[in-house]
Amino acid sequence: VFLCYAGHEGSAFIDRELYLPQSWTGDPQRCKAAGIPDITKFATKPQLAKQMLERALDTGVPCGWVTGDEVYGGDRHLRLWLESREQPFVLAVAKNEPLWWQGPTCVRADRIAESLPARAWRRLSARAGAKGERLYDWALTPLWRLQITAEERRFGHYLLIRRSLDEKREHAYYVVYAPRTKASRQTLVNVAGRRWEIEIGFEAAKGECGLDQYEVR
């Protein structure tokens, strides 16, 4: 699991954690033979991500937004932890992610998308890629939360939806937590587009130092 930092001037990996499945952590002899410390316990990928984010934030790494794919966005504990630190995020979730919309009743992300009128969609670029601008149709709708204090109400919860322009009309879904003053559609689209930075980093690391062949050890 890798943590990638993306800024205006570029991006770089700044931390990593080795994911070990339970078939490994539950087999002490296997771990001993591989040189894995006895104290190593099983941790999910979102839990490893939290450890890295906590290290980065606690050491003062400037962080405007956190973004990641469905593996991390689908973990509510990670999302709630980020909220507890008032750390804005745009995290991908699955189409069947249950969300509070228009009240304290769960609605699937794809059902929310189906309910939005045509005027809710706007064509925007999620940054330029190798083949030009990454154009998609995007919709943004607020999610419901019980917010009592003025401090809680400073932040909003939203569902950002991306729809492809081809015949497949494929959708992607993002749960957003952000200050209401910063939650413009274009800003959130830009953050969602930053997730490609980690894929760019992987390709560069594979070509330059054989990351896919573990030549960096």
What are the residue ranges of the model-derived segments?
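Short, basic/hydrophobic alpha-helical segments
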Residues: 40-64
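Short, surface-exposed basic-aromatic patches at helix termini and helix-loop junctions that form
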Residues: 58, 79-88
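Short, well-ordered secondary-structure "scaffold" segments embedded in the functional core
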Residues: 66, 71-77, 182-184
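Short, solvent-exposed helix-loop connector elements
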Residues: 77, 111, 183-192, 207-217
